[in-house]
Amino acid sequence: LKGHFLLISTAKTYIEIPFRYRLAGKLKLHKFLPSSFLRKPQWITYYLFGVVTRDARKLLREILRDTDLQFSQWAINQILNWKNLNLPESYIHVHGTEDRLLPNGNAQIYIEEAGHLMILTHSSQINKIIDDFLLSVNSSSKQ
């Protein structure tokens, strides 16, 4: 694993943000999203985040409950209106095959049957990738 940036469950450029999100940003549709949608997960929330187990659903409920509402609204606005076209010079991109929140077909490493919360639901696989990444960065910096 050679690279200087480790990107997990994300998009590298705005082109990887689904068109429907970019369109929603242009039309400012997210401004009409009720705050209850950001606080209390609905079936669509579970679907988008790819959580299927009872424990994962409980964890997502806790995360949403504990997340600052203003931060959530700010973050959604930033994602929907992001215009980055610059790729990092050197990176490793890790993505879940079942990530419906940010579906992506341009990663170098895919975690099978993993959704957007794969750092929690597939933590042993992600930890191994992080360990390998840190070892490669450390060994390349010594050369």
Predicted regions and their residues:
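C-terminal alpha-helix
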Residues: I129-S140
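Catalytic histidine-centered segment of alpha/beta-hydrolase-like enzymes
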Residues: A114-I129
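Flexible "cap/lid" loop of the alpha/beta hydrolase fold
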Residues: G3-S36
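Short, proline-enriched alpha-helix->beta-strand connector loops that line the catalytic pocket
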Residues: L87-Y91, P103-A107
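Conserved alpha/beta-hydrolase catalytic His-Asp/Glu region
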Residues: F37-N84
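Active-site loop signature of alpha/beta-hydrolase-fold enzymes
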Residues: T13, R100, L117
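Short beta-strand/loop motif that positions the catalytic acidic residue
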Residues: H93-H95, D99
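Short glycine-/acidic-enriched loop or helix-start segments at secondary-structure transitions
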Residues: L1, E16-I17, L102-G105
